[in-house]
Amino acid sequence: MVKLNLGCGLRRIEGYINIDKSGASKADAFFDLEEANMFYTDVEEIVATHILEHIKNIIPLMNNCYQMLKVGGRMFIEVPQNEGIWADPTHVRAFSSLSFRYYCGYPFSEIYGITAKFKCISQEFIANPDGGVLKVVLEK
């Protein structure tokens, strides 16, 4: 049973392959997520907690995640919302409640090179003093 924790930084998850590009992280495997070159198969879960906002070209990464997941596998995403998105100078993109529909079969998404066709299982906004977070669960 393969489970991936993308952009783990110092947040290791036991039982997952913890992935990061930084040698200062607590990663088990080192990948630059900008290159979307991971070759795992039959992945059951992918956790992407506060990493997608750091990715300049997210389309190849989302396509790669979809490709790696087994049928019924899930991707758990958490991204900052509202003012919190631009508080960190390393954030390069923002997300809204509509952002992930392009990876869920939204019309014309293939024009942008999107091959992922996730099913959106849930989406939840959780307010906090930093502006809040958007939690999304996608399934292959």
Regions found by a protein language model. Name each.
Residues K56-Y66, K70, R74-K140:
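S-adenosyl-L-methionine-dependent methyltransferase catalytic module, highlighting the catalytic core
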